[in-house]
Amino acid sequence: MEHTIAQNKAPCFGGRTPLFSQRDLLRLVGPLLVEQLLAVTVGMADTMMVSRCGEAAISGVSLVDMINNLIIVLFAALATGGAVVVSQYLGAKEQKHANASSGQLILLSALLGVGVGVFCFVLARPMIRLCYGSIDADVLEAGVLYLRITAVSYPFLAMYNAGAALFRSMGNSKISMQISILMNIINIVGNAVCIFVLGMGVDGVAWPSVLSRAVAAVLILNRCYQKGHMLTVPKTIRLDGRMAKRILGIGIPSAFENSLFQAGRILVVSMISTFGTVQIAANAVANTLDGMGCIPGQAIGLAMITVVGRCVGAGDNEQTVFYTRKLLLWAYISMGIFNGGILLFLKPLVGIYALSGETMALAILLVQIHAGSGLFLWPASFVLPNALRAANDVKFTMVVSVLSMAIWRLGFSYLLCVRMGWGAVGVWIAMVIDWVCRVICFVARMKSGAWKTKYQA
């Protein structure tokens, strides 16, 4: 059946066989969707469980999660660089280089994870003070404890991300999904036991994360070294300057872009934190629910890297454009369904959390802003640039993201949140303005075709 589909569609590409069938795309996107759904669901469970420990605890965890997200994007950016390079080599049918680059990704991820973990463990308190200034003492203590414990998991998380990126590059996201299911079961069961049975606080949320990430890293690395996969990871890995440079050539601009993006988010949350615990808690709950609305877009964005990377490596710009449009359409349809559902059942969803009436009302308003705007703007703002990254057009995406964050999101957040006193609502309106700028720039870049000149075999 798959062969028949490929033959029928071949004339669309001048008689060339499509690099991906409909079934290939579904096999890639489906497990990624499940994996993203699990991640967000467990994040919601974490927030709900820790909310039972009081609003100081939920505020401390939410503030540190912004820092954790900043760290995680470093690992994700490196994994993205590796996935792009491996996908391009596979598309060009250069198996030897694809194998070598997979080993370099694992080595670089391990080094980065250990370095960042030690740094955050030692400097947890000054990091939180630097990011958020004067916050309540109980919120600070909860945040320091949570950051130090989660820092222990960074090396495991970095290596898991590397392994998952390699399997995505092979078009096999099912393996990372299976391991993710186990990881999230360990996490959520551990949280329940630690908080409800043992009576622990924020440490009861943090330690299960460490355990689950350690198990996931061991399992996925074990699968990477098994035979029978499209890639053969070298058993002995030494740093290869040329190959590492190629991976970092994609990873560093992506890391810089995403790190500054997360740093910008931390800055705007620091503005919100000056308005008190109600605004911090409402912002935390809204962020968790909005993460649910972005699940399909994030999954398709990851698939975009593999698909476009393979097309670019094969030197087929026509298929690159075709699959970019196809996946972007999938993102709009799926995000419409998810965000529509969130808006429809918004009050019951927010009601799950143990919030005061004032906090609940604000959280509902923030989700309405995000979900209503995300229907139209999020896919082109965050899924489309992954196609540009996979074509090595990373500097453009970096410049647009950084400038848009600095000028629109930070600038208007200060104006609306601080100067006009709108609080969290002002920050979220500024976020929508940032999205509009990103959409205009990324759509124009894709249509211009300038990305076609960035890849060199």
Question: Model segments located where?
Answer:
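Short alpha-helical transmembrane segments in multi-pass integral membrane proteins
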Residues: M1-L32, V86-S153, I195-I252, V308-G374, ...
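N-terminal transmembrane alpha-helices
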Residues: R16-M48, R52-C53, N69-G81, V85, ...
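Transmembrane helical elements of multi-pass membrane transporters/channels
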Residues: R27-D46, I149, M183, S212-A216, ...
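Helix-terminus/linker motif at the lipid-water interface of multi-pass membrane proteins
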Residues: L37-S59, I128-A137, V193-M200, S259-M292, ...
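Alpha-helical transmembrane segments of multipass membrane proteins
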Residues: M44-M48, A162-L166, I185-V193, L221, ...
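Interfacial/gating helices of multi-pass transporter permease domains
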Residues: V50-N69, A137-A142, V202-D203, M243-I250, ...
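Small-residue-rich hydrophobic transmembrane alpha-helices
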Residues: I58-V118, L157-S176, V269, I280-L346, ...
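Short runs within selected transmembrane alpha-helices of multi-pass transporters and secretion channels
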Residues: A79, I149-R168, S176-N187, V205-I220, ...
